Curated annotation (Swiss-Prot):
Belongs to the G-protein coupled receptor 1 family. SUPFAM superfamilies: Family A G protein-coupled receptor-like (SSF81321). GO terms for molecular function: C-C chemokine binding; C-C chemokine receptor activity. PROSITE patterns: G_PROTEIN_RECEP_F1_1 (PS00237), G_PROTEIN_RECEP_F1_2 (PS50262). GO terms for biological process: calcium-mediated signaling; cell chemotaxis; immune response; positive regulation of cytosolic calcium ion concentration. The chain crosses the membrane at residues 36-63, 74-93, 108-129, 147-172, 204-223, 240-264, 282-305. This is C-C chemokine receptor type 8. It is a multi-pass membrane protein. Keywords: Cell membrane, Disulfide bond, G-protein coupled receptor, Membrane, Receptor, Transducer, Transmembrane, Transmembrane helix. It is found in: Cell membrane. May regulate monocyte chemotaxis and thymic cell line apoptosis.
Amino acid sequence: MDYTLDPSMTTMTDYYYPDSLSSPCDGELIQRNDKLLLAVFYCLLFVFSLLGNSLVILVLVVCKKLRNITDIYLLNLALSDLLFVFSFPFQTYYQLDQWVFGTVMCKVVSGFYYIGFYSSMFFITLMSVDRYLAVVHAVYAIKVRTIRMGTTTLSLLVWLTAIMATIPLLVFYQVASEDGVLQCYSFYNQQTLKWKIFTNFEMNILGLLIPFTIFMFCYIKILHQLKRCQNHNKTKAIRLVLIVVIASLLFWVPFNVVLFLTSLHSMHILDGCSISQQLNYATHVTEIISFTHCCVNPVIYAFVGEKFKKHLSEIFQKSCSHIFIYLGRQMPRESCEKSSSCQQHSFRSSSIDYIL
């Protein structure tokens, strides 16, 4: 959904209107006046997302050792967010200068963005289905919720689906010179306008409508089951995933709504100069909001995850003990024992596993 690289709509490059499809109305268009501020914004997002999601991966791999299928999904979700922000360093340079990385990297960077978006939404959807099975169909879940199922079958299927959904979006990406400035963007003319509308609806359907429908079904069933059974352990088991789902919807729904309205505008169902300018402005705002989601999940884990902060503390203590040993010092015995608990502590894996 990287409209950051679509010059006809976003903050990432100057406006360009192929043929007469999106010719500017009379009056001032929304232009990018503060490139430096936007570049700083991308840098901050990249740093915080890289740090936060790397810590999540470290906790899952080192402390929890990927003991259950939920850990596998959380690991893939963190990888999706990292893939999403891979484009930010390129976009930062793009803000300050021009696209100097060539056509291949134009498609590759855009591809990482789209794959990161799709895979993130798909894994959140998969986690919701997983919680549904664990709570509503606990006996059946014990049979199907295996590490092998999560790592080989479902995870690979999600990544493959995300890649396949991305390919049509990359066909029209190219590098061209506008007023002597190299730009990376998706180009549509009168003949290919239908593909722009198709890809917009594809993102609406695959990135929001289908996941949202599954979310609603799963959590209505889960809440009904919890209301009937009053199981405190099951309530704790779904809380974190539910918060992640709600946060993702809050960050992505506004952009998808604007994307849908933009498709209607391209089809001339919505028309007029005022609507065009309002959609351009709304795209700027909702795009920036959606970008921020890549930093949110680690923050949620830190505040909601019961064991996440504990695992981070154990990793930090263990690192400190190694530093002290390297420096020829000794830590107090109690600290050393606590630092080693990260590897010695065992977690019970069942159909209702605790998350971080």
